[in-house]
Amino acid sequence: MANQLILLKKDFFTDEQQAVTVADRYPQDVFAEHTHEFCELVMVWRGNGLHVLNERPYRITRGDLFYIRAEDKHSYTSVNDLVLQNIIYCPERLKLNVNWQAMIPGFQGAQWHPHWRLGSMGMNQARQVINQLEHESNGRDPLANEMAELLFGQLVMTLKRHRYATDDLPATSRETLLDKLITALANSLESSFALDAFCQQEQCSERVLRQQFRAQTGMTINQYLRQVRICHAQYLLQHSPLMISEISMQCGFEDSNYFSVVFTRETGMTPSQWRHLSNQSD
């Protein structure tokens, strides 16, 4: 695409030897679709927003982790106090003898699964390493680049150790109620979610959990679940031949008319209009 925005190495790296650096987004504003001359890891700390990656929408919030390749197209819209960090790196500049392909999904042709989650424990450990990495990447002493790359290696290993699929928090996990709740919501795309039953199972206060969720994500629990379902519906409308009534069922809406009302309110167009517009742009 001739008018595609491309983020350039020279605007982010201090010199041609620097392999990795950190770009803070406190907060992340709306950002038009773009690609890069480099790769990046995206770590979401707080708030929420709509992250569209290669035309697939994701409603993101605390704990979301993305592995972005240079050629990937992505953008940020509908942001609400969204705080994240981009750890950006140039694969060809990495010198450390590490099996990067085993650590980073999509690294130089490795199998790519872009979207993961981190629980609170993983986030805390990653944040400590990122803070050190940011300090070294801004350093000017002769060993700063080498130290930054060592810390990057530690970071990608930490992320691999703690990441999990969005709907599959390990049964042995010691993560917080908030992490368990977000995983439970991801497992409720096609069925109703009963918060009272969840709280009874976890022996926690429903009122306190609602407050914690809103404080960390900027949304209510129902708003988040609705947004996740609508994102899934957008993807199915564009990439599957399913009828709208079938998509409605797969996204937790038993009434297709109600689904259309909610979809239109959230996106500004009907499901049919979305599908038509998406097919035109393909």
Curated annotation (Swiss-Prot):
Residues 196-217, 244-267 bind DNA. Keywords: Activator, Cytoplasm, DNA-binding, Repeat, Rhamnose metabolism, Transcription, Transcription regulation. It is found in: Cytoplasm. It comes from the Bacteria. One of its GO terms (cellular component) is cytoplasm. One of its GO terms (biological process) is rhamnose metabolic process. Gene3D superfamilies: Homeodomain-like, Jelly Rolls. The record marks E246 as: Interaction with sigma-70. Residues 179-277 form the HTH araC/xylS-type domain. It holds the Pfam family AraC_binding. SMART domains: HTH_ARAC. InterPro entries: AraC-bd, Homeodomain-like_sf, HTH_AraC, HTH_AraC-typ_CS, RhaR_RhaS-like_N, RmlC-like_jellyroll, RmlC_Cupin_sf, Tscrpt_act_RhaR. Its main location: cytoplasm. GO terms for molecular function: DNA-binding transcription factor activity; sequence-specific DNA binding. Binds DNA as a dimer. Activates expression of the rhaSR operon in response to L-rhamnose. This is HTH-type transcriptional activator RhaR. It comes from Salmonella dublin (strain CT_02021853). The lineage of its organism: Bacteria, Pseudomonadati, Pseudomonadota, Gammaproteobacteria, Enterobacterales.
